[in-house]
Amino acid sequence: MAIIFALVARGTVVLSEFSATSTNASSISKQILEKLPGNDSDSHMSYSQDRYIFHVKRTDGLTVLCMADETAGRNIPFAFLDDIHQRFVKTYGRAIHSAQAYSMNDEFSRVLSQQMEFYSNDPNADRMSRIKGEMSQVRNVMIENIDKVLDRGERLELLVDKTENMQGNTFRFRKQARRYRTIMWWRNVKLTIALILVLALVVYIAMAFVCHGPSLPSCFK
């Protein structure tokens, strides 16, 4: 799965988050939030850790962050962040400014999950990201090492469950299962129709024999 973790925060107050697998990305993300510049100027940032990158979009004091596999590039993660920012602002509006930590999590974590799945697995997401990826601020985002940004003497270890692709595989399995059920349903329908036709033919032949002819002359005088 390309995008593994995401959160929405006001300053350092996390309002909603979702993780597609077992990882300590949440605690690392909170440290990133604490180290972001204090002003509320709009910005786009990326921080690398092993083969993962934390992408950050800050707009109007609202921060949207995601952790993605480095193979996802920049366009898809930032298109995802832009999408999430728009959805969050549209859904909660002014309530964002006074919301308590995780007060939107029960509802919006489902949106994060759905959009993470879409941007990680749906081919249409790549086309959308190419359009949004033309923004100069995305092209010019510098990727810094996260240990340098957090100014830690010891190496920060990111822990990610090796089964991180499970959700993507589950999504594909569900699609295949639905397709298989549809095929089996049509097969059963066709088989039922064929049995009805065969039964009708057998009844007709029997009646034709009893009624002395294909036009059933002795039965319909």
Swiss-Prot record:
One of its GO terms (biological process) is response to salt stress. It comes from Arabidopsis thaliana. Residues 7-112 form the Longin domain. Interacts with subunits of the vacuole protein sorting (HOPS) complex including VPS11, VCL1, VPS18, VPS33, VPS39 and VPS41. Belongs to the synaptobrevin family. Involved in the targeting and/or fusion of transport vesicles to their target membrane. GO terms for cellular component: Golgi apparatus; HOPS complex; plasma membrane; vacuolar membrane; vacuole. It is found in: Vacuole membrane; Prevacuolar compartment membrane. The modification N-acetylalanine is found at residue 2. The lineage of its organism: Eukaryota, Viridiplantae, Streptophyta, Embryophyta, Tracheophyta. This is Vesicle-associated membrane protein 713. CDD domains: Longin, R-SNARE. The chain crosses the membrane at residues 191-211. Its main location: membrane. Keywords: Acetylation, Membrane, Protein transport, Transmembrane, Transmembrane helix, Transport, Vacuole. The keyword Protein transport applies. The gene is VAMP713.
